[in-house]
Swiss-Prot record:
One Gene Ontology term of the molecular function aspect: peroxynitrite isomerase activity
Protein name (database record): Peroxynitrite isomerase
UniProt-annotated stretches for the region Disordered: 1-23
Sites where the protein binds heme b: T63, K168, H195
Length: 205
């Protein structure tokens, strides 16, 4: 993982883009651009590089085999002590064109007492609701200023939800300022198996 280059960042087209907003609410609007809207809460500074709208492609693996997908991830805030997260994915055909909608998740990043060391460290807490019918709780730590590792701590499934094991995720800012990640999930044999990976470019923020 790499440290962001502030000078290069200011030259990106994304610096002038942000989320569309309605102007009639008496509350701060969500912003995915740190140059606009409320200041980022001090409690979230360790996650500052994640804020933005990210778009790109990745590779996935399911019971039918390997596939490619497109993805947009929106990481925003309203000045509160959490970040909002919305990730939408769509499967691509052999020509790289849209084929069908696939995974979608929404949730919140925040910091909480580390369940493994409550007296010493603050852990990243990521709560995700998946469109496939399950809710997942991750805990993790920053590895450095631009990478973060999380592991599933608890998983609850609806009666119609997908049968799925826990996961390990690694996110990081890589060369060029892109957001890259790898997700492994517990497979049928009880071990972690490759599930998703992607490299996304900053579209806004």
């Amino acid at each position: 993982m790499t440290e962001p280059d502030p000078a290069a960042a200011e030259q990106r087209p994304s610096v002038g883009r942000n989320l569309p907003t309605f102007q009639d609410l008496p509350i701060p609007a969500d912003t995915a651009n740190l140059r606009e809207g409320p200041d980022l809460n001090a409690a979230m500074l360790a996650l500052l590089p994640l804020v933005g709208v990210w778009r790109g492609e990745g590779e996935g693996r399911d019971t039918d085999g390997d596939y490619r997908f497109g993805q947009q991830i929106v990481v925003a805030h309203d000045g509160s002590d959490y970040l909002t997260w919305d990730a939408r994915s769509w499967r691509l055909d052999a020509d790289g064109q849209f084929e069908q909608l696939t995974l979608r998740e929404t949730g919140f990043w925040r910091f909480a007492p580390d369940p493994n060391d409550p007296d010493e460290n603050q852990a990243i807490e990521l709560v995700l609701a998946h469109a496939a019918g399950f809710v997942e709780l991750f805990y993790g730590q920053p590895l450095n200023a631009s990478s973060w590792e999380l592991v599933t701590d608890a998983l609850a499934r609806s009666k119609s939800g997908a049968l799925i094991g826990g996961a390990k995720r690694l996110y990081g800012i890589v060369d060029g300022g892109d957001l890259a990640y790898v997700e492994e999930r517990v497979g049928a044999d009880g071990g972690l198996e490759p599930h998703l990976s992607a490299r996304l470019s900053r579209f806004a923020g």
